[in-house]
């Protein structure tokens, strides 16, 4: 598995990321916010996302949202392809997103916004308060 800072070469994955988020929201019957491919592309183009790939196959994704002139940074849109769930990859993606956020936005307060119990547990184990 490769955990990468998403860049323009990863734009081709925007549709599958958007579809995977939509599928997960429907399957779990939760209030997961849908993200359009164009929204995902904007995060990728600005290097504000982590993508996980198995060779060229999409595995997972998480993006960075910025507020208040970079005073605040949130991690959002965490998704893992159903084929790869249960392997601890969501936690690794969140860890990589946290590290990338600290390097890119060193003066920002970092937080996570979620209503999902699994993501809350990951955030807790990573030290989010």
PLM features: residue spans?
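A short beta-loop-alpha structural element at the N-terminal edge
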Residues: 1-17
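Conserved acetyl-CoA-binding loop-helix of GNAT-fold acetyltransferases
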Residues: 80, 86-101
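Conserved GNAT acetyl-CoA-binding A-motif
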Residues: 101-115
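Conserved acetyl-CoA-binding loop of GNAT-fold acetyltransferases
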Residues: 124-129
């Amino acid at each position: 598995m490769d955990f990468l800072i998403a860049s323009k070469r990863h734009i081709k994955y925007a549709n599958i990321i958007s579809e995977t988020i939509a599928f997960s929201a429907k399957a779990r019957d939760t209030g997961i916010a849908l993200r359009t491919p164009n929204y995902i592309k904007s995060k990728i183009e600005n290097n504000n996302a982590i993508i996980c790939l198995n060779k060229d196959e999409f595995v997972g994704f998480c993006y960075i949202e910025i507020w208040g002139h970079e005073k605040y940074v949130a991690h959002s849109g965490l998704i893992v392809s159903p084929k790869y769930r249960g392997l601890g990859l969501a936690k690794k993606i969140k860890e990589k997103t946290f590290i990338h956020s600290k390097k890119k936005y060193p003066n920002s307060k970092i937080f996570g916004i979620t209503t999902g119990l699994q993501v809350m547990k990951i955030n807790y184990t990573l030290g989010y308060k």
